[in-house]
A protein has these predicted regions:
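Extracellular/periplasmic ligand-sensing ectodomains of membrane signal-transduction proteins
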Residues: 49-123, 128-136
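Second-shell loop/turn segments in exported
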Residues: 30-34, 100-104, 157
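Extracytoplasmic/secreted envelope proteins and their assembly/folding machinery
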Residues: 16, 42-46, 111-114, 145, ...
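Juxtamembrane extracytoplasmic/periplasmic/luminal helical "stalk" adjacent to the first N-terminal
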Residues: 1-39, 43, 47-50, 54
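Amphipathic alpha-helical bundle/coiled-coil segments
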Residues: 5, 9, 49, 106-111, ...
Length: 171
């Protein structure tokens, strides 16, 4: 039992490290005025999932994405924009090295996966909750997220999700 507890702690600690690396990457790019490509950000998220097979999704949500990306002009038809044109990518590992790409809903500070990170201004872990993916699939998951803070203002949140099924399988 103790070894399982240690293994689970290692997974959670690793997940927190992943989220910290995501937020550090984004904040550093903003502070150094480095324009990241949206495609590069998607690849970064895919690599996170590839290197951490217990994770289900990696995502980034912005209240204001103009700190990092040029404004959406409608010409890019990739599925990582909200209806208002904000870059909010959600990459999901669907097995066999394949990934689905969609956008998060419009940034709402009260959404369960954003709320704790926005309010605490630090890495947060949610209680398990049910989330409906764009294809209608409902998944019981938990989120580890961290705020993107520029000039003491939360402009977005990065995060990863893991399913409770994955945690149960690890035990």
């Amino acid at each position: 039992v103790k070894s399982y507890a240690n293994e689970q702690k290692a997974i959670f600690d690793g997940t927190i490290d992943v989220v910290n690396s995501m937020v550090n990457r984004v904040e550093t790019a903003i502070k150094t005025d480095e324009k990241l490509t949206k495609e590069g950000m998607i690849e970064f998220q895919k690599n996170i999932l590839k290197n951490n097979d217990f994770l289900y999704t990696a995502w980034i949500g912005f209240e204001d994405d103009s700190y990092l990306f040029d404004r959406y002009d409608g010409s890019d038809k990739n599925p990582y924009y909200t209806p208002k044109g904000v870059f909010q990518s959600l990459v999901t590992a669907n097995g066999n090295g394949k990934y689905d790409l969609e956008f998060l809903p419009e940034f709402n500070k009260n959404d369960i996966y954003l709320k704790n990170a926005v309010e605490s201004k630090k890495v947060s872990i949610t209680e398990p909750y049910e989330y409906e993916m764009s294809g209608g699939k409902k998944v019981l998951m938990a989120t580890v997220s961290a705020p993107i803070i520029i000039n003491d203002k939360v402009i977005g949140v990065v995060g990863v999700d893991f399913t409770l099924e994955a945690i149960n399988n690890a035990i």
